[in-house]
Amino acid sequence: MKKQLQFKFIGVLVVASTVLTLNSCKKDTPASEGVSFEAVLASGGEFAPFSNEKNLIDVTTSSVPVDSGNWNCTNTTWNVMQGNQDFPLYDPNVSVVYPGSLLQGASLNNATPDVVAVKRGGGTVSIDIINGSGAVYVTVPEVKKSLITQALNDIIYNNNAVMPARFTFQHEVVKTKEELALALGLNVEIVPVTVVANLSFSNQSTMNHYLVVLKQSFYTMSYDIPPSYGDFFDPSVTPIDLAKYVSPGNPACYVSDVTYGRVFYLLIESSSSLMKIEAAINVSFSNAPVSGDLNASYLSSLDDLSVKVIALGGTTSSTFSAISASQLSTLTNTLAQSADLNAGVPLSYVVRTVYNNKLVKNKLDIEYTINDCQLVP
C-alpha cells in the first residue's frame, strides 16, 4: 500500500509541474515532460519471488459405524504453491497470446489476460528450427496480431515438414479437482469449460484417478527482445499513454515465446489399485515418447476402466469425449500419426516483464482437502 501511495503522489507532482509550465510559458508542452518509460515501467514493481512448497495445514479423523464395520476417514488439508516457467493454453483461439504481445501482469492468471493497448513499434519473430533454411525470421513494421500472424504463417510456409510422432510422457495421481488443476498448470477458478466437461471426476468413491499427458512440441516462435524501452512502442506513444495500463502490482509484460504442437490429456479412472493402474500406464505408454505407440491391452485389463481425453492440435478435433476400453485402438491410431508443422496449435507461452526482461512464473497457490476413507470390518 505504501508503494502505491508513493506512485500516486509522484503522479500528482508531475501533473502539477506540467500545469505550472503551461501557465508560465503559454505554449504547448508535451504532457509526458519529466516522465520516462523507465519510470512508468518501474512503477509496476516486480513479482515477488517464491519457491515451490507443499505444506500440511490440518488433519482430522472420523469413524462412522455401518453394518459391515466402520468407515474410518482421514481428512488432510494441504496448501500448495507451485511455479512453472510457462503458461499453458487450453484454448488455441485466445487472440491476445502471440509472440510480442503486451499484457498486464496482474491479469496473467486470468482465462484471457488483459492487454496493454498502445501502438507498438516494429519487431522480429523467429522459429527455433535449425534446418539450413534462409527464412526463419520475419521483421514487421508494427507488432500487432494481424502482422505477427502473417509473419508466423510465412515462416511456417517456408519451413513446413512432417514431424515424427515423438512425445513427452508424464503421469501422476490426482485425487481432487484441485490436484487436477495443479497438474494442468491452472488455477481452480479459471479451469476452462472444456477441461471441466471432458476431464470431470467420477463421483464413485471407489475410483482412482491418473492424469496422463502426452505432448509433442513442434516448434517455438520467439520475439526478439527490443534493445530499449522506447523500441517497444511507436514514436507517437508517450509514457503517459503507457501509464494507463501500469500500476503497482500490475507491471507491463510481454510474450517472448510461444510453443506450438499437439497434446493429449487422458484422465484414466479405474477401481483397480493405484499400483496396478500405474503399472498398466507405464507398460501401455512405454513406447509413446518415441513412436506414439500405445499398447491398449494393459489398460483394458483394469477394472471399471474409463478414459476421458482432451486432444489439442494435429489433425484431431479439439476435444474427445470419454472413450471405453474397447475404443482405445482409436486413440492408439491417432497417437501414432505423424503431423505437419501447420497442424500445431499454441500449447504454452513464456512471459517476461518489460522493465527488466525477467521471466514471470505461472504462480499457482491452491488449498484443498483429501478425504481418504477405508472400510474396516
Question: What is each of the regions a protein language model found here?
Answer:
Residues 1-5, 12-47:
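Bacterial Sec-dependent N-terminal signal peptides
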Residues 3-9, 290-294:
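Intrinsic disorder/low-complexity segments enriched in polar/small residues
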Residues 32-377:
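Membrane-permeabilization and membrane-interfacing ectodomains
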